[in-house]
Amino acid sequence: MADSANHLPFFFGQITREEAEDYLVQGGMSDGLYLLRQSRNYLGGFALSVAYDRKAHHYTIERELNGTYAISGGRTHGSPAELCHYHSQELDGLVCLLKNPFNRPPGVQPKTGPFEDLKENLIREYVKQTWNLQGQALEQAIISQKPQLEKLIATTAHEKMPWFHGKISRDESEQIVLIGSKTNGKFLIRARDNGSYALGLLHEGKVLHYRIDKDKTGKLSIPGGKNFDTLWQLVEHYSYKSDGLLRVLTVPCQKIGGQTGNDSFRPQLPSAHPATWSAGGIISRIKSYSFPKPGHRKASSPQGNRPESLVSYNPYESDRGPWANEREAQREALPMDTEVYESPYADPEEIRPKEVYLDRKLLTLEDKELGSGNFGTVKKGYYQMKKVVKTVAVKILKNEANDPALKDELLAEANVMQQLDNPYIVRMIGICEAESWMLVMEMAELGPLNKYLQQNRHVKDKNIIELVHQVSMGMKYLEECNFVHRDLAARNVLLVTQHYAKISDFGLSKALRADENYYKAQTHGKWPVKWYAPECINYYKFSSKSDVWSFGVLMWEAFSYGQKPYRGMKGSEVSAMLEKGERMGCPPGCPREMYELMTLCWTYDVENRPGFVAVELRLRNYYYDVVN
């Protein structure tokens, strides 16, 4: 969460206020001397420590919901660095201008907090246990959903802590604290019925109770004390500083056999859990815990409805209280919750049919068409697999003239699709020869990206960034498999949910041999020229690098909410424009960094154009920065 500041030489990471003051003293305490540190109270926030009049002054920098940073009541900024630069020129509430940064001494790295140290392992274990993923499916889930998973882990980490006892009464909490050792500072936290919490603290043989309130914004605090985003941050703070309590927190109170309180809410502790509260930080005690499962992957059903029992935490929605999981309100799924994240044949009991031909008797079609084209129509259907009924999209070949070329095109597309298996690519279930040739594929209910964005202008930038990043992950996979798509456009990206995109339509796709890096077409066909790189138009040469050009156009479509590229221009006019070095302008409201990536994708010289490895990494880093 400190990624946006780690590169700054004056950023010290998660040091305490006292440590910051010590550093400023080392620097001479001259007016305007300053350093930046990570907030110990707010997720993704920072604190600015400034010397003035021989005293240290501290300002909290909160991360706003839109991803900007601001000192309370002050102007918002795109990054902590921009905020510091601004306050080097404008007071705007500070005691003095920022003049001299106090940089970290040589060899000193930003200090990571306990959660930062462990979050990679926590996320990996959480994804493994919650969605039962392994291998590439696990890695893809972590990469694409890391910001959401970080928030999920951070805001629910207290449920796995030894000091959190769930819903127990005040009397029960006193009994538990008084069992065993009577060490001063022994403590536990319990949940109260109104959504707040209470701290039980042992002092001189008596249990003191402190209320932990939760305000409308979700901030937690002991009355009169500091605000915190999470319970574990609150506990970490009061473990090194009493700050209004009679004493600091020392020893967490263990659950009795892991069976007290609300066991449906709280995971059972492993029997090997250590009984002592040794050095190493509060969070270090959750390494060996098993995570509760908020939901499982969506089960297939003919109706395509999501059972209430499978509803899981949705990090895209605002917090609705600590007991939101107990409510039956519908929440939107993460990609891993959907039935199309993994291949239907990932289940070893589901045997892939030989030569991918399906039994027509097991396929049911709806009458309503989802779409149509020169090839025929697409309908929604249901395919009876061995264990489940799977909702599918069926491309039905319209071949009244019995043209063998049309059948060959469909079979060629099927041949490409059967070789691909990635969460961000529409998978083929199989092909069916009956009243017509049919290509049976995974269903993406929300349809093409361009049409969805045209009809849903409320979709925010960070949601669009999330979707185009997923597309880049799918294209990186194609690049690694030596496939060229040749028809990458927003119309061929289908949405499973508002937060889950898949690449489709492999009718023009080609597999390259291991010794090839491009495909050369023999003739000019009915090509989507406005999405094509100059070398495709001029020399009929197609490669992953030409797909990168198309991806830049797709990004432009997405950030312009489904508008047509080069509107009103003919293909020849577009070619002339590109030859002159001109490119489409930045869509209104599009982040500067995203337009810069588009123009990089539109590099004329194919050798200097980035590949999808570089494009995906750049998108990933920006996505993490704006969503965190």
Curated annotation (Swiss-Prot):
Changing K395R: Loss of kinase activity. Keywords: Adaptive immunity, Angiogenesis, ATP-binding, Cell membrane, Cytoplasm, Immunity, Innate immunity, Kinase, Membrane, Nucleotide-binding, Phosphoprotein, Repeat, SH2 domain, Transferase, Tyrosine-protein kinase, Ubl conjugation. Belongs to the protein kinase superfamily. Tyr protein kinase family. SYK/ZAP-70 subfamily. This is Tyrosine-protein kinase SYK. The gene is SYK. It catalyses: L-tyrosyl-[protein] + ATP = O-phospho-L-tyrosyl-[protein] + ADP + H(+). One of its GO terms (biological process) is regulation of platelet activation. GO terms for cellular component: cytosol; early phagosome; plasma membrane. It comes from the Eukaryota. Autophosphorylated. Phosphorylated on tyrosine residues by LYN following receptors engagement. Phosphorylation on Tyr-316 creates a binding site for CBL, an adapter protein that serves as a negative regulator of BCR-stimulated calcium ion signaling. Phosphorylation at Tyr-341 creates a binding site for VAV1. Phosphorylation on Tyr-341 and Tyr-345 enhances the phosphorylation and activation of phospholipase C-gamma and the early phase of calcium ion mobilization via a phosphoinositide 3-kinase-independent pathway. Phosphorylated on tyrosine residues in response to IL15. Shows high susceptibility to proteolysis. Its EC number is 2.7.10.2. Residues 254-363 are annotated as: Interdomain B. Residues 103-162 are annotated as: Interdomain A. CDD domains: PTKc_Syk (cd05116), SH2_N-SH2_Zap70_Syk_like (cd09938). The modification Phosphoserine is found at S39, S196, S288, S290, S309, S312, S343, S372, S572. Interacts with LYN; phosphorylates SYK. Interacts with RHOH (phosphorylated); regulates mast cells activation. Interacts with NFAM1 (phosphorylated); probably involved in BCR signaling. Interacts with VAV1 (via SH2 domain); phosphorylates VAV1 upon BCR activation. Interacts with GAB2 (phosphorylated); probably involved in IgE Fc receptor signaling. Interacts (via its SH2 domains) with CD79A (via its phosphorylated ITAM domain); the interaction stimulates SYK autophosphorylation and activation. It comes from Sus scrofa. Disulfide bonds: none annotated.
